[in-house]
Amino acid sequence: MNTQNEYYGSVGLLYTPIKYVSATLTTDLTRSMLDNNFVNGPNPKRMASQSVLAVQYKNSRFTATGSLLGTYITDKVEQGEKPDDKRRLSPAVSLSWRPFSESTLRIRASYKDIFRVPTFTDLYYLRMGNTNLKPEETSQYNVGVTWSSSCGDWLRHFSISADGYYNTVKDKIVALPTMYVWKMMNMGEVDIKGVDVNLSTQFRLPLRMSLLLASTYSFQYAVDVTDPEAKNYKDQIPYTPRHSGTVSVTLENPWVNVSYILTAVGDRYALPQNIDRNRI
């Protein structure tokens, strides 16, 4: 039996030196503890500090934001090995532009440097955990467009968004089956190219009811590029479908809301090589 507790605190400052320009400084502190009833269990404790300095310029048609995230994480364990302390600076930049003042069309672009530390489950879960895991490092580039509108009383809202992205991932954390149990591992280097499309509408119905329709589609080409000589070079990484999507229908009324969600995914592979016997 596992029991995890977390204590969280945050403080932030906002400064607006001139019109359209603002600066923020925030710090989050998290204390996490995992206890279990296993003999000689690690019972890890984690202290995490995340501080963000961000500067933003924003007017009615253009927004630009730059930020720098500083992360420090340290673990302590009662038994066994503990991972090294983690320190990292992660920059990010985002832009959003509305080219026509009379339209809701927006064009956006962003760059993020993402640093993901292994979770307690990744590191310490019985038989599956791996204290030798390295943090997952990602450089993420994104370009997209959004548009929304209202078309009279019967169509309250319609919106569409489309984004294309390219990610380079180092030491991606994945779960892979071994002879008897699953094991958390790093996958060297992974290239990810993808497209996300989202549609949503809301219709007004009689008797104070409304109908919400939404759909999403994702294409993700995520391939292992660690070793050009390996058999799985440029093969799709395990348990990551190239195609996936959802469709949802929701009926809202003053008494009870009813929803139906359909999710579909394409072929995936249980192991790094994309061969028929590994397909699921």
For the regions a protein language model found, what residue spans apply to each?
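Structural signature of outer-membrane beta-barrel domains
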Residues: 1, 30-34, 71-75, 112-118, ...
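Gram-negative outer-membrane beta-barrel transporters
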Residues: 19, 61, 159-168, 185-273
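Residue-level detector of the transmembrane beta-barrel scaffold of outer-membrane proteins
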Residues: 22-26, 54, 63-67, 92, ...
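Membrane-embedded beta-barrel scaffold of Gram-negative outer-membrane proteins
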Residues: 100, 107-110, 135-193, 198-202
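Outer-membrane beta-barrel translocator domains and adjoining extracellular loop/strand segments
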Residues: 1, 34-42, 76-83, 119-126, ...
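Face-selective signature of the C-terminal outer-membrane beta-barrel domain
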Residues: 1-91, 161-164, 199-201, 208-216
